[in-house]
């Protein structure tokens, strides 16, 4: 998608509006449970990038997450069948109730509507990634560009405000939604049309 450029304020140092009551009560409860005598705003500030001005140029940006290292393959791919231990793990998975299985830096399998999808892990380093992108005429966003793509320069903790929206369906949170087919809200396209920064367990790579 085309993302227009702008001169924006990035980073975070204080609440623009303030936590809503539900979010503050939950944080205070967690602090009591962990026996932490700290101000929630101070703790959040320590995890944030400093406030700064940035001039962001216009750019064309991929709309969806593309995982590096993981290559989709068919189940009969020789690189899979050469590892009987992986195939045994896959067979055990097929008889389980799990939705996916990842063998660390080796292989992965997930259930789909049509059966199963498998991947193999191809090790690469940062320089190889940059070189491969350059050959395709592509590049990674800088840290400032990435922050702009996520938040558009908003000064609240989240794009929609300072507090959590408890009506949203989010990955890795207790799922209270009875409709399992409902999409995860943070994976929906944002104001730029991008699906970005929606999974804390998926690190997104930037140009550094």
Give the label of every model feature segment:
Residues 108, 112-208:
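Functional-site microenvironments in short loops/helix caps that host divalent-cation chemistry
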Residues 1-139, 144:
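Extended beta-strand/loop cores of jelly-roll/beta-sandwich
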């Amino acid at each position: 998608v085309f993302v227009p450029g702008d001169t924006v304020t990035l980073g975070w140092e204080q609440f623009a509006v303030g936590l809503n009551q539900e979010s503050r009560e939950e944080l205070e409860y967690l602090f009591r449970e962990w026996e932490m005598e700290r101000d929630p705003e101070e703790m959040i500030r320590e995890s944030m990038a400093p406030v700064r001005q940035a001039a962001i140029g216009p750019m064309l940006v991929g709309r969806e997450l593309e995982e590096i290292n993981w290559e989709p393959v068919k189940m009969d791919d020789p690189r899979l069948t050469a590892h009987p231990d992986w195939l045994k793990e896959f067979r055990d998975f097929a008889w389980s109730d799990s939705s996916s299985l990842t063998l660390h830096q080796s292989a992965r399998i997930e259930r789909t509507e049509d059966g199963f999808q498998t991947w193999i892990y191809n090790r690469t380093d940062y320089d190889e990634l940059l070189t491969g992108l350059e050959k395709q005429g592509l590049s990674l966003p800088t840290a400032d560009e990435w922050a702009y793509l996520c938040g558009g320069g908003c000064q609240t903790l989240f794009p929609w405000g300072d507090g959590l929206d408890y009506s949203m369906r989010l990955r890795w949170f207790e799922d209270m939604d009875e409709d399992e087919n409902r999409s995860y809200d943070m994976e929906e396209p944002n104001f730029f049309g991008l699906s970005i920064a929606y999974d804390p367990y998926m690190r997104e790579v930037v140009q550094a």
